[in-house]
Amino acid sequence: MTSQFKNSINDYLEGLPEAVLTRLYQSPATCLAVFRLLPALARTLIMGMIFNPDPIAVADVDALVKPSSQRLKLETQKKLRLLHIFTETQAHIIINPTFKKNLRAALVGGDQNISFGVPCDTEDKHKVDVAFLDAHAVSQWEMILHFMVGTSIGRTPSDGVLNLLKHSGLMEPERGGLRITNAGFQFLLQDVNAQIWTLLLQYLNMSEYLQMDPVDVLNFIFMLGSLELGQDYSLSALSETQKHMLEDLRDYGIVYQRKASSRRFYPTRLATTLTSETAALRTASQSMEAATQDTISSSVAADSGFIILETNFRLYAYTESPLQIAVLNLFVNLKTRFANMVTGQINRDSVRFALSNGITAEQIITYLSVHAHPRMKGMEHVLPPTVVDQIKLWQLEMDRIRATDGYLFSEFKNFDEYKDVSTYAKELGVLLYENPGKRKFVSTLAGSQQIVEFVKRRNQKHRSSAN
């Protein structure tokens, strides 16, 4: 998991009241998951305390840390205090007894309270293997990503998924449908593990509005991260909240159930890697591919870049993935598609199209850099500086020119009439543009009706004076 999203889930936990965290720490599986999410120094300090019956002296902690790392030590202790794992006196550091007891139970296998799930004790007549679970997870997750980038694959995510995408700000309503937002494009830049945590954090936020117990929700998420891939688990130990969650998580590809009424479920690799230290991977399919290989080198290869960008703005993408091609289509004018490659051109219109849809120049540059071909990453500049500068200039151009709907007033009888009416528009604060020499000005649409009424009153007053 990436450090960015570790911080996000930790930030969420740090914001919880002590009473809620104490309830969370009653689950050994949750204690183990929280422990895995902590930075290395925090884990070291905790391991030095959970098998020690006495509080640890502050001086002993200081002795464990180099003088040059004192700032890191203070930050770590602050994090552990916010998580209510540590409390400190002037002389000692005391570990939360509930956390201590249940983390120790998780580490030594003393958990008797089924927090790590209940494996089914009967054989599944429709048992599935790991390859099937991987394919199912890829299919469900990439369906969501395809929908976000506007690729038609014949299937649409469930209403629950669509509501979550809107609630999280990854997509927004437009013309009866949904379109990807700036945050949504940033979401596509993350590895699949980080993407899942993004949606799960938003799910946690939504659960509060739905009056779901956040402790139940978190315990289930952390439990999923500790389950065994390929093992089927019983629903008998799940609360009603967790059974409801299971229905939602099926739609994300995090768990598999053959049918809604099934009394068993299988965690997929998207679930079992939630709290793991697996290297970040860029897509669900690459994650599955790398996870099933025997060597580290294959994992690295699965994540190698595929984009070559030339100084003439021509782009070559060595990919067969419809999803990656659809993402490129958001800011590249694609020209030709071959069996394992697409070509295209980055130009003013394609970048302006992306900018108008909320994607920033920096995000485009980041995407191209992250997915650059190894040959490009070996050069002095990963991307041609001229291309990078031009993409930024196109955004500056968009920032300078803003389109605003307005109402044009012209053909005044004389300059006095023009001046009276334009002055009135200024006083109302609805004047957008004026050209006194040509006796023209533009007002906002909202203020145009008031100006029309003013012109009518002025003309009527002048006619009355003439009579």
Swiss-Prot record:
Cellular component annotations (GO), alphabetically ordered: transcription factor TFIIH core complex; transcription factor TFIIH holo complex
Q: Which Cys pairs does UniProt list as disulfide-bonded?
A: none
Keyword DNA repair present in the record's keywords: the answer is yes
What are the GO BP annotations of this UniProt entry? nucleotide-excision repair; transcription initiation at RNA polymerase II promoter
User: Where in the cell?
Assistant: Nucleus
Record GO terms (molecular function)? ATPase activator activity; double-stranded DNA binding; RNA polymerase II general transcription initiation factor activity
| Pfam families given in the database record | Tfb2, Tfb2_C
Please classify the protein's predominant subcellular localization into one broad category.
Answer: nucleus
* UniProt entry tagged with the keyword DNA damage: yes
Assigned keywords, A-Z: DNA damage, DNA repair, Nucleus, Transcription, Transcription regulation
What NCBIfam families does this protein's entry cite? Answer: tfb2
Subunit and partners = Component of the 7-subunit TFIIH core complex composed of XPB/SSL2, XPD/RAD3, SSL1, TFB1, TFB2, TFB4 and TFB5, which is active in NER. The core complex associates with the 3-subunit CTD-kinase module TFIIK composed of CCL1, KIN28 and TFB3 to form the 10-subunit holoenzyme (holo-TFIIH) active in transcription.
- Tell me, what does this protein do in biology? Component of the general transcription and DNA repair factor IIH (TFIIH) core complex, which is involved in general and transcription-coupled nucleotide excision repair (NER) of damaged DNA and, when complexed to TFIIK, in RNA transcription by RNA polymerase II. In NER, TFIIH acts by opening DNA around the lesion to allow the excision of the damaged oligonucleotide and its replacement by a new DNA fragment. In transcription, TFIIH has an essential role in transcription initiation.
Entry's family note: Belongs to the TFB2 family.
Q: Could you tell me what this protein is called?
A: General transcription and DNA repair factor IIH subunit TFB2
Lineage of the organism: Eukaryota, Fungi, Dikarya, Ascomycota, Saccharomycotina
Q: Which gene encodes it?
A: TFB2
